[in-house]
Structure formats: C-alpha cells, structure tokens
Amino acid sequence: MSPAAAQTAIPLPSTDLPVKIITNGLKNLNYTSKQGYGNFDTHFYDGQDEVSPSGLLKIRKSYREKSKYPDYLPTWDPTEKYGPLEFHEYHDPALRADGNFSNLFAKENVGQLKVKKITPKLGLEINGIQLTDLSDAAKDELALLVAQKGVVVFRNQNFADEGPDYVTEYGRHFGKLHIHQTSGHPQNNPELHITFRRPDAEEFARVFDDSTSSGGWHTDVSYELQPPSYTFFSVVEGPDGGGDTLFADTIEAFDRLSKPLQDFLSTLHVIHSSKEQAENSQRQGGIKRRAPVTHIHPLVRVHPVLKKKCLYVNRAFSRKIVELKRQESESLLNFLYNLVESSHDLQLRAKWEPHSVVIWDNRRVQHSAVIDWEEPIHRHAFRITPQAERPVEDLKFLNDENYYPSSLTLDI
C-alpha cells in the first residue's frame, strides 16, 4: 500500500451549502455554475456499477471479466477521506536536465529512433524509446522535452504492462502525486486516476442529452492550490478508431493577443473551483474524498521552465475573474475559452493506438476527449498526475508559500 493510501481517515464537513469566498482583502464573491454533463467516465455510476458486501464501489462484474487490464479497473471507497492538500515546494525536474538530451536520445538508440513533429509548433510523436528503460537523468530530459513541445506521444510502450505499482512509482520522479477528489482508482493505488467509459448505449447517449458536442476543454484539476505539471495518460483499451484527445497551446494563444490586451490580462486573477465536480459525483451515487476547494490563480501564469506566459483559464473549472463585474467576467472568459477551443491552428489531435503513452505539460496545454464512436465499446485509461508549483504571474514568487492571491477559505 502506498503512503497516501495509509493516511488516517479524516471526517470532512458537508459542502452542500452555498460557498462564500474570503479573499484576503478582496470583496467576498458569490457565484454559481453548471458543469456540462458531468464526468461519467471517472465517477461511480449508480445503477450501472456495483457495491460489494464491504461497501466498496466497483465496475459491474460483466465488465470486469472482459477487461484486458483488470489491475487498472477503478474502485471507489466511501470511507477513504483526506484533508486539504498542503503547500509544498516544487522543483521541476526539467530544470536539472541536459538541454542536449544526451541521456534521453542516447547515441546507441539513434538507429532505431523515429521522431516526428505532430504540428510545426506543438507536439512530437516518438518511436524507438521505452519509457521503462529511462534513467533518472533521462527522465529529467523527458520533462524538459514535454515542456518544450507541450505534448509528446510515445508509441509501442510496455509501460502499462508493468502494473499500477510501477507506473505510480515512475510518476513520483516528476513530483508529489495528486489524489483526485472523486474519481476511481485501483485498490491500493489512490494516486492513479482512472477513466472507464462503459460500453453502454445509454451512457453514450447521455453525453449528448444536453449538448451538441462531446468536447470538454480543460486543464487538469486547475482548482487545486498546486495543479499538475507533467500528465501521463495511457488508453489501455478503446475503440479501433476515434476516441482521440485534442490539445491546444495556451502559450501560442496568449502570444496572438494584442499587446494592450496581454498587459490587461496579466493584471487579472481567476477563481477556480472543484465544487461542481464533487456535486456531479455525488449525484451519480459516487464519493467525495476531500472537501471541495476553491483557489484563485493568475489569469496569465509564467511557465517556470520556458519563462513564457500562458493563459490559465478553462471552461470546466474557471468561474469568475476576481477584479471584474460578473457580466464583464463572463464576456472576457468566453472570449478566451473560444480563442483556445476554436483556433485549430494552435491545436493538435493525438490518435490513440495500442501501447501508447501521451505526456503533456498541464500548465501549457488544455485538452479535450473526443467521444465519436458509435458502437458500445468501453474506453479504459489511466492517468498519473504529479503536482507542480503554485501558478504565479511572476517567477519571483515561485515556491513562495505566502504568495497571494491563491489563498482563500470556504465558509461551509
């Protein structure tokens, strides 16, 4: 059992009451939001899934028996509780790396190495390197490569075959691993985030019940005090075609704005919240491991490795620009959402093949799953999510525990 799994259960208060935000001198801000159709591939689904005699929630038996990777199937334990995540310093492994990539692209592997740009500015596809063979120095260079390219797709990997314990330990090289507030994880591996879209026509139809698109652009758990750095994701089972993942570059999006707008945006801060995600889980009969959190982050953050500015807003978890009135905030946020989501010339489409691992820089890119297959085929994937630094608008605040404006409390 991992250290995180062994933490003492902590009783947490209900959060079904309205949220009041206290912002260290800023006005109290009240807000409401609806979050699309919910996370049906990460949350327990009452009526589809099962409850064991011990109270453990799990995927139904008929799906478990057909799984090619049963060790990665999600479970949800209603007794598993954690306190709030605490601040910790983060030292990006990319800052330790050899910029010549002499370990990652070792001379002895050059003959079998195939590297292809996915787009001129964003993304690489690599064949001929096994992630499981990398030394610690090569992993540092991997972090640097992902920061520089935004998204790196590795083909023909044995990564998932090594099992949940191995991939969890692998992820720890890149930072303290995040434990999700509601999603399923393999038993005894709480740091793995599992997505499992069930092969059920009704569930597929639910995606489009209230929307004309399956798109759900976001950056992972931006509501946390210290959101992730390098996200590792692998689809272990899925459709033969479709189910791709879209990525958009928020550095490029920021660079395309006019200088006056760039300067104005760089003075603003945004509320990010997990409240709606937790409510979605509970509506579906699922769990809540921690009390929902709300944090304020700069609208424009500086990437600690690239020293470049990124737009740090996303439709899933951003709620309001602190300094603006509600209507002003909604108009500006929608403009920025649409800029990132609709500018296809700053995006790429990662196609899933068996034994692929995609690694992306969660600070730089947004992503969205594409649900476009029609047959009732399940899509099963796992994610490793190392936490990064607290987002800052100036690197002089990097790893400063007293940096404001992220700190706030929930009056619940």
Swiss-Prot record:
It comes from the Eukaryota. Fe cation binds at H218, D220, H367. GO terms for biological process: alkanesulfonate catabolic process; sulfur compound catabolic process. The keyword Phosphoprotein applies. Its EC number is 1.14.11.-. Pathway: Organosulfur degradation; alkanesulfonate degradation. InterPro entries: AtsK-like, TauD-like_sf, TauD/TfdA-like. The modification Phosphoserine is found at S52. Keywords: Dioxygenase, Iron, Metal-binding, Oxidoreductase, Phosphoprotein. One of its GO terms (molecular function) is metal ion binding. Its cofactor is Fe(2+). The keyword Metal-binding applies. Belongs to the TfdA dioxygenase family. Acts as an alpha-ketoglutarate-dependent dioxygenase active on sulfonates. Although taurine is a poor substrate, a variety of other sulfonates are utilized, with the best natural substrates being isethionate and taurocholate. This is Alpha-ketoglutarate-dependent sulfonate dioxygenase. The gene is JLP1.
